[in-house]
Amino acid sequence: MDRREDALLQALQTNASETERWEAFKRDNESTIRNLDKFAKNLSVEVMVPIGRKALMPGELIHTNELLVGHYEGYFSACSSHKAKEICQYRLKLAEEQLKKLAVENDLWQKKLHTPFAEGAVPSGDQVEIVEDFNEESHNKWLAEHRKRMRQQKQKERLEREAEPVKKDNEVLRKLEEREMMEELGLDPDNIDEDQLHDMLNQEPLKSTNESSPKSLTQEEEDELWKKLEAEEQNEADELSSEAEESLKTTDNLVRQLMSGETETPSSKKRTAGTNRNVEIQDPISEDDGDDDDEGDQEEEVRTIREQMSLLPNEDREPFLRAQLHVLKAKMRKIQKVNFISDELIHLMNVVVMLEDDLQDLVFEQELEASEEEEEVVENNHLPDEPSKELSTVSESSTNKRRISFALDDEKLEFRREETVAEMLPNAKKNSRDIIKLNAPLKPAGDPQPASIKTKRQTTQDILQKVERNIEFVKENQSVQDFDLLNRIMEESTGLINTLHISFTHSGAIPSPSSDQSDGIPGKPSDFYVRYEKDRARPNDSFPIYVNGFEGEEHVKVPIMSEAARGSAYEDPRSQFSKPNSSEICFTHSGSITPTSNDQSDDIPGNPFDFYEKYEKDRAKFSKSNSSEGDATDPESATKSILRNKSAVDLEPHNVNQQPKKGRKVRNQKKKERTLDDDLRDMSAYQKVMHDLVEKEPTAPEPLPPGKFIDSHAPKKRVSRFKEQRALNKT
């Protein structure tokens, strides 16, 4: 025991040291998490830095979001404060799990150490351990005697079972039958007398024989049995009171009528037909109350038959209901032959009564419809001399029609394409409408008017005829183009421009003169040829026709031009300001003598005449230098040109100012000296620009060169042909 206690105490000490170590580890991680939350908020944190073991100095922590986390065996990793916080949380979770395990271990060692002393497993103090002596020989002797006694007991039980009667199972069944009989008779099994129970059990086989005897009875014996039963009923009826006697008679009559099939139970509608108006108003309310009370007491057979009837048309409901009643009555006859009064027979009687009421309702509705049709015929053929009779018929019909009913189930309307609305609602009652006849005879003011005017009910055939007449009216009076509107739009949008080509053959015959026709109207085929020649000689300035074209399309598409016209059309209009054109400066020579001036030099012009003299001198000098250079260096004048289309090349406009691009080698060459032509060209361009700025209106657009062209800088306007055609159709 001492060694055991020493081992347990040593284990408890080890557990305590481990618990302390893990708690310190947990506290370190918690403080680290708090510091990380604090340092991550700022870029730098002021701290006291230890110097040695006893000295501190103020310092500052920088890069607080960059940390170096230490792992096992001298491994470190650089990470952010967020990642370092996750590592600390993981270590904190690990420490909590270890502390839980250490707590469980500590509890286990404590129980092993203190439980034996607390529960009395080990004696302590005045306690003494219980010790029992065990002798193996005496124990074996007791076992032998025990086996012998058990064998004798088993043999005794076997003899008792053999001595018991064999019909023990029959006794159990007999007792169960007695219990069932007492429950059926409503007897209390605890208070019943055994002698009375014995007598009842002895009379049971006699009853069974009597029950089986009617199967083999003759007609005479059956009549005698009926007479005995009637005599017993008569004796019982004498003992009953007057009210019980009346109820019994009505029940017997009802059963006999149901069995014979001669039931004619008057419905509530017929019973109220002869009463006055006050009773009439109250009867439907009571009838509805009764229906509401009977809805919960409906038999299952009645509910099933009514559901089947709701699926049938009105014409087939009455035969179906009569067939079901016939089947139920036959079933009641079979049951009554076996047992005169039983629960099943009473159940079928209730079912038959409910179905008879439904049959009377159907018959009543058919009579109402027939009476309404007769009233319509009478109203159509009535004479003005009989207003009193007409009023009486209306009052009688109104008394018979007074009814309030509610639907038992929700009706579902299925829309079918091939059927009319009247066919979809077979049970719906159509609302009658008043017919106003213009040619009807006028009635005297004193004659009483009927309460309501009934019109002939529209049938399915009448509705179909009206639909056919409407379709014929649409075909005759509505345009076909309205039905085919989509095709008409497509034809107009996809139409083509067809050109008629007429070929002419010139004949040498002399045409006969005609004075009765004008020149514009062709009178014979030769006039077409003359007209064609005239139109051909006339210059055609019109825009070419495109297939599927529309008005204004020439502003979008590229016109067909010749090469010369194409060059002038696509030429940049801004290039005309850079072309030298000496013909723009015009001088008119006058015959007057110019005055002499001595205060000016020859190079500076003093008046317009000086401009002209300088222009003539420079022109003569320029032509003389060109002629000398052309005579010396013009090898092409003596040779033939290699261009096959030289005339077309000469006619094409060329950019005179276009100069070859200079390479790197000619960058350092001197600039060409300006001549008089350059000054004149610049002056003409300046005057032209100034003239346009001064004389033209500021809002007027800049003139374009002749010819049709497309502005490449402007985006093309996309025009939908369908929208264009639709706009034309609207106009």
From Swiss-Prot:
GO CC term (a single one)? cytoplasm
GO molecular function annotation: chromatin binding; phosphatase inhibitor activity; protein phosphatase inhibitor activity; transcription corepressor activity
Answer whether the UniProt record assigns the keyword Aminoacyl-tRNA synthetase to this protein: no
GO biological process terms on file = intrinsic apoptotic signaling pathway in response to DNA damage by p53 class mediator; negative regulation of intrinsic apoptotic signaling pathway; negative regulation of transcription by RNA polymerase II; spermatogenesis
Q: Where is the composition biased (Basic and acidic residues)?
A: 611-621, 721-731
Entry keywords, A to Z: Chromosome, Coiled coil, Cytoplasm, Nucleus, Protein phosphatase inhibitor
InterPro entries named in the record:
Prefoldin (IPR009053), Prefoldin_subunit_alpha (IPR004127), RNA_pol_II_subunit5-mediator (IPR052255)
Q: Which residues form a coiled coil?
A: 91-115, 143-176, 220-258, 357-379, 452-477
Q: Which family does it belong to?
A: Belongs to the RNA polymerase II subunit 5-mediating protein family.
- What PANTHER family has UniProt attached to this entry? RNA POLYMERASE II SUBUNIT 5-MEDIATING PROTEIN NNX3, UNCONVENTIONAL PREFOLDIN RPB5 INTERACTOR 1
Binding partners and assembly: Interacts with serine/threonine-protein phosphatases flw/PP1beta9C and Pp1-87B with higher affinity for Pp1-87B.
Provide the protein name.
Unconventional prefoldin RPB5 interactor-like protein
Q: The organism's lineage?
A: Eukaryota, Metazoa, Ecdysozoa, Arthropoda, Hexapoda
